A protein has these predicted regions:
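Basic, Lys/Arg- and aromatic-enriched nucleic-acid-binding interface segment
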Residues: 3-53, 57, 78-79, 207
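General beta-strand recognition
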Residues: 9, 70-72
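Short, basic (Lys/Arg/His-rich) helix/loop patches that form interaction surfaces
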Residues: 32-40, 49, 86, 94-108, ...
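Short coil/turn motifs that cap or connect alpha-helices
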Residues: 52, 60-62, 156
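Well-ordered beta-strand positions in beta-sheet-rich domains
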Residues: 70, 83-85
Length: 207
């Protein structure tokens, strides 16, 4: 059977090149704090583990081990066709722990469109692969090892060193990996009228 969920990343992953990262940690915090629970896996896992869209679309919650603090990207899910293990940071664990974790992490491709609609409604730019690029840039500022980040991201050390080193400071990276859920986070709602394109968040029309 053809993988329908995987089709959404055809353009973004056909030629994965380094691009824009999220400009400020406040922007990521804003969109995470506004997101309903169903969009949090895409946002939090993308921002704090750097998993590719294609890999995320094929990921099952059984591969997310909060006790061991790892996400297993199996060979059939990875772009490079080789298994890798991605660490779960403390703040990513805080985002994932309250969620219902059964079945596919991304159950429908509509979730990606809703993330784009949410960012647009909040006035936040959403370049292609922005979460992955942001993660790699901030992660290398923390661990200071292109080899380690390459293993985690499923990329080559040469690419990491050439394109992502010194794009951000350690202080900025520390703020990125300190973004945590806010009180009442689970009550967020977000709807997009498919006919009119109007966005309603927490009962209020945004646009």
């Amino acid at each position: 059977m053809r993988d329908v969920l995987g089709q959404i990343d055809t353009i973004s992953n056909a030629m994965e090149t380094p691009g824009d990262k999220m400009g400020e940690f406040e922007q990521m915090q804003t969109i995470l704090h506004a997101a309903p629970p169903r969009l949090l896996p895409i946002l939090a896992i993308g921002a704090f583990s750097g998993i590719r869209v294609a890999e995320l679309n094929r990921l099952d919650w059984s591969a997310v081990d909060l006790d061991r603090r790892i996400i297993e990207i199996r060979a059939g899910q990875a772009k490079t066709a080789s298994r890798r293990v991605v660490p779960i940071t403390d703040n990513l664990a805080a985002w994932l722990e309250p969620l219902e974790r059964q079945g596919r992490v991304v159950p429908a491709k509509q979730a990606h469109r809703d993330v784009a609609a949410l960012s647009a409604a909040l006035g936040i730019a959403w370049p292609r692969n922005v979460l992955r690029h942001s993660f790699i840039s901030y992660r290398i500022a923390v661990v200071k090892s292109a080899d380690q980040v390459a293993l985690e991201a499923g990329n080559s050390p040469a690419i990491i060193f050439k394109h992502y080193r010194e794009l951000t400071t350690e202080d900025q990276a520390d703020k990125w990996f300190a973004i945590l859920p806010k009180e009442g986070q689970s009550g967020n709602t977000f709807l997009v009228d498919k006919r009119t394109g109007k966005v309603v968040m927490n009962g209020k029309r945004l646009r």
